Amino acid sequence: MVHTGIGYDVHRLVEGRTLWLGGVEFEHDHGLDGHSDADVLMHAICDAVLGAIGEGDIGAYFPPSDPQWKDAPSRIFLAKAAELVGKGGGKIVNIDATLIAEAPKILPHVPAMKAAVAQALCISPDQVGIKATTNELLGFLGRREGMAAMAVAAINMPD
């Protein structure tokens, strides 16, 4: 039976941090603020996968209060989510994720982002969709104060 999960994440943009999106380092004047690397796209994907298998959210496994996750790469979080899928006898069918940000443009980086997400989840890049949109200059996203991402995961689980 196919189970679906939805993930959403948002982080504030700050000076002095490296910007990571979909497991790829971006040249940008600001980075996302968070306890880990704050990769908003990978966090949304992680929550979608965990939600699809009824395993809570990223904070349940990697609480921001735990110092071991300080500046941790988000690929660790995705790998754990994939491990939980496998332990339950499931297989990830596909991931579809959208970044919401005014900048930077991600199109040239999408193949590398898909590869990074796929590697962390032990799936093919063909099973990963990544796209972006702006917030049409509206709200905190439009003012470039932060970035958001949403994701859907489809996972085939045994009956």
Which residues are covered by each model-predicted region?
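RNase III-family endoribonuclease catalytic core
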Residues: M1-M113, A120-L121
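Short active-site-adjacent structural elements
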Residues: L107-P108, L137-L141
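A glycine- and small-aliphatic-rich helix-loop capping segment at beta-alpha/alpha-beta transitions
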Residues: T18-W20, A116, R144-M150
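Short acidic capping loops at alpha-helix termini that bridge into adjacent secondary structure
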Residues: S124-Q127
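Glycine-rich, charged/polar anion/phosphate-binding loops
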Residues: G5-G7, E136-G139
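C-terminal edge-of-domain segments
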Residues: L141-D159
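Pyridoxal 5′-phosphate
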Residues: I130-T134
